[in-house]
């Protein structure tokens, strides 16, 4: 992926303001609520029976933070996203058998979360840069399936 200086700046400046715990938890919860079939990958998380249960589930909260923390590695390594996610790709492909389409869904949910948290800063140019980033991360995570 080729990044312009403007794209890198838009991504890193917004990332510096992101509360990883809050946004990560919200993004994963939204994924599980909006796309309920994704819940099958989280069978050990306990009660995911409704939106309220998901929003208050400590496992969702903790894993959302973990997911967004790893996403931060992409922000730090914009020029090496494939290598950054090689191990996670292998895990999600070979052990967890996660449908790679779910990576795209999570990326799109993350865009919505960021837009809702950073209404003024999340300009169309910022959205375009972040959309490019979440697409690159989804692609890198799906490489283990090819």
Curated annotation (Swiss-Prot):
Matching Gene3D superfamilies: Globins (1.10.490.10)
GO biological process: hydrogen peroxide catabolic process
Family annotation (PANTHER family): HEMOGLOBIN FAMILY MEMBER, HEMOGLOBIN SUBUNIT EPSILON
Top-rank lineage group of the source organism: Eukaryota
Species name: Chrysemys picta bellii (Western painted turtle)
Protein's UniProt name: Hemoglobin subunit beta
InterPro entries attached to this UniProt entry: Globin (IPR000971), Globin-like_sf (IPR009050), Globin/Proto (IPR012292), Hemoglobin_b (IPR002337), Hemoglobin_oxygen_transport (IPR050056)
Subunit structure: Heterotetramer of two alpha chains and two beta chains.
Similarity comment text for this entry: Belongs to the globin family.
GO cellular component: blood microparticle; haptoglobin-hemoglobin complex; hemoglobin complex
Gene Ontology MF, one: peroxidase activity
Primary gene name: HBB
Pfam families given in the database record: Globin (PF00042)
Entry keywords, A to Z: Heme, Iron, Metal-binding, Oxygen transport, Transport
Globin domain: residues covered: 2-146
